[in-house]
Amino acid sequence: EKTRDLALFNLAIDSKLRACDLTKLRVRDIAHGMQVTPRAIVMQQRTHRPVQFEITDQTRAALEAWIHQAQLRNEDFLFPSRLHRSDHLSTRQYARIVKAWVTSIDLDPAMYGTHTLRRTKASLIYRRTKNLRAVQLLLGHTKLESTVRYLGIEVEDALDMAEHTEV
C-alpha cells in the first residue's frame, strides 16, 4: 500500500492531471514494458485534448517499484481498484487516500484535496517563471483566463509584475 501511495502521490504532482484522468491511467500510458518513460501524453476526459507531462526520476522509480510489486501488465490500470465492481481506483477512493495523507501530517483536510496535488507543480512553475502560457499548456487549459483564475493570480500580482519589468 505504501508503494502504491508513493507512486500515486508523486505521479499526481508530476502529471498535474485531474483525478478523473489520473485514476484511469493504464501502465501503457506511462511505460514501455517495465520501463517508465520520462514523458507521457494523455487525452483528457474533460477537454478531449492531449496533455503532456514529465515524469521525474523519483516518480519513475516509485512507479516502477509499484508496477513490479503489483505485477501489473501493460494493459492494466496503473492504480487498480481493490473492489470487483470497478476496474480502477475511483476518484472518490483517491480523494479518501489524499484526505488520509493530509490528516496524517496534521493539515486541515478541508483546505487540501486532490486538486491541491494538481495545482502544486503548476503553481511552483508559475512562481518561478511567470510564464502563464507554459502553465496553461501543462494543465491542458483551453483558455488563458482559466489558468489565471486557477492559479489565483490577482490584479495585485499582475501590477507587481508590471512594476518590476523593465522595458
What positions do the PLM features span?
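Conserved catalytic core of the tyrosine transesterase superfamily
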Residues: 1-167
